[in-house]
Amino acid sequence: MLLKTSRRTFLKGLTLSGVAGSLGVWSFNARSSLSLPVAASLQGTQFDLTIGETAVNITGSERQAKTINGGLPGPVLRWKEGDTITLKVKNRLNEQTSIHWHGIILPANMDGVPGLSFMGIEPDDTYVYTFKVKQNGTYWYHSHSGLQEQEGVYGAIIIDAREPEPFAYDREHVVMLSDWTDENPHSLLKKLKKQSDYYNFNKPTVGSFFRDVNTRGLSATIADRKMWAEMKMNPTDLADVSGYTYTYLMNGQAPLKNWTGLFRPGEKIRLRFINGSAMTYFDIRIPGLKMTVVAADGQYVNPVTVDEFRIAVAETYDVIVEPQGEAYTIFAQSMDRTGYARGTLATREGLSAAVPPLDPRPLLTMEDMGMGGMGHDMAGMDHSQMGGMDNSGEMMSMDGADLPDSGTSSAPMDHSSMAGMDHSRMAGMPGMQSHPASETDNPLVDMQAMSVSPKLNDPGIGLRNNGRKVLTYADLKSRFEDPDGREPGRTIELHLTGHMEKFAWSFNGIKFSDAAPVLLKYGERLRITLINDTMMTHPIHLHGMWSDLEDENGNFMVRKHTIDVPPGTKRSYRVTADALGRWAYHCHLLYHMEMGMFREVRVEE
């Protein structure tokens, strides 16, 4: 099934993306045979942006995308550190819209989150954003209304530094990755609510069972399958939405359109990678080239040279490469190995290099999920407590409207859950993770990780021991000391929770509509600790303030705006509450945010 899915994804590239890049920051593909709208690169201090609908053809079927200035992605916005900029955003849709400036430090009323920052932009209205640019680097912008981000409302931001940068380069290219579906995103979400593994076509088979028996033995294989079955989970379910429906894009172009970035041999090329996907993690490499990482989430880091790196949804990485040949493939495979985005660095248009095959499909283990050594205990627990619970989820969409009832699947389901087991004895055991009372007997929580750690030096599932040097969070060190300098005065611990079968997501098992705001005192320095009690990886984003990631010993390590939290991990970061107002705090997997993994953070004097 993997080969069929991959081939299908690859063949989608035979048709053209509805939009091409500009001749400025994007490189136009000279082999395009359609007249395509161009996403311009805009720079200065005054910007006019219009959000509307544009016909696109990415897979061979014409669809209506929601676009900014007619482009997918929208225009690259180039600002200068220290400038005050004004952006007039006109809404030509027949629904409310918005733009959030991801990772940008600005006043709360300029942040672009309807219901928190402002009331949103109604049809035919214009909203004027204006703020001073206080940083430099690579960032991006996107809609924060409904599921519009999935439909095309996103683009790149480049902020030129006021002072000389600590590295040299001769040329740059933005490489913006995204995922596109021809389906209506609301229909896609309904399918996930009815059957959370609807898009997972890589489930274990009889053949894989016998392969596991050969490598692990019969008893271990049966015990492993039994545990997964009792938990109503699947070790291949790494991404809720896969290449079965997604086409993976690089600067708006499908794989066979071969987006091309030009260079001259011997030049140092800065590649500004942005993951603007709704749901997809990418593993990126350029066969034949080393990549030197020089910035993460727009902030300078000590240079580290790697062969490959994983980019979580909403993260950005800047790398320097020094190509000497004629053509190199930029290969970005999805974490679940169901497809890829692809482009080329070349000395002229029309060149291409070999495209590597997808890596083998990875499988989650109990250890990955923080369940190491607990398998036999879980296999014998009582899973019956939640069988009669309501499957509606009662979730609220982020624009405040009740989601329609998604119904139930055609087959009756046993809502088994590890959250129903007795953890009272485990809480006092050495190394065992405690959990908030709100998770106990909770119909929105189907598992609890019991043995967690930061895992900062772990490249991640599917990247371990692959023969390549892979970037880890432990490699990332800011080129500056802790900008605040104070030790955190308190710690807020939050658990990332979910119920896979119901496709319900939350913090501490409390859905957004029922959750009280997280209150911060203006000026305080605090620590936020995140514990992942799910089998999914979550990129967590706090608006308006930096997230200063700590190492295992509680020391400042690297400044980011999005923190990746894999299964079975416990990661801490420091926050300075220096921005008054109401701020969004959420998982940046779009459908997880929509289904409840969202909180309001309120900074008050």
Curated annotation (Swiss-Prot):
It is found in: Periplasm. It comes from the Bacteria. InterPro entries: Cu-oxidase-like_N, Cu-oxidase_2nd, Cu-oxidase_C, Cu-oxidase_fam, Cu-R_CopA, Cu_oxidase_CS, Cu_oxidase_Cu_BS, Cupredoxin. Sequence repeats lie at residues 382-389, 414-421, 422-429. Cu cation 4 binds at residues 538, 587, 592, 597. Residues 1-41 form the signal peptide. GO terms for cellular component: periplasmic space. One of its GO terms (molecular function) is oxidoreductase activity. PROSITE patterns: MULTICOPPER_OXIDASE1, MULTICOPPER_OXIDASE2, TAT. Cu cation 1 binds at residues 100, 541. This is Copper resistance protein A. Pfam families: Cu-oxidase, Cu-oxidase_2, Cu-oxidase_3. Cu cation 3 binds at residues 144, 543, 586. Residues 382-429 are annotated as: 3 X 8 AA tandem repeats of D-H-X-X-M-X-G-M. Its main location: periplasm. The keyword Signal applies. It comes from Escherichia coli. Keywords: Copper, Metal-binding, Oxidoreductase, Periplasm, Plasmid, Repeat, Signal. Belongs to the multicopper oxidase family. CopA subfamily. Cu cation 2 binds at residues 102, 142, 588. Required for the copper-inducible expression of copper resistance. May have oxidase activity. Predicted to be exported by the Tat system. The position of the signal peptide cleavage has not been experimentally proven.
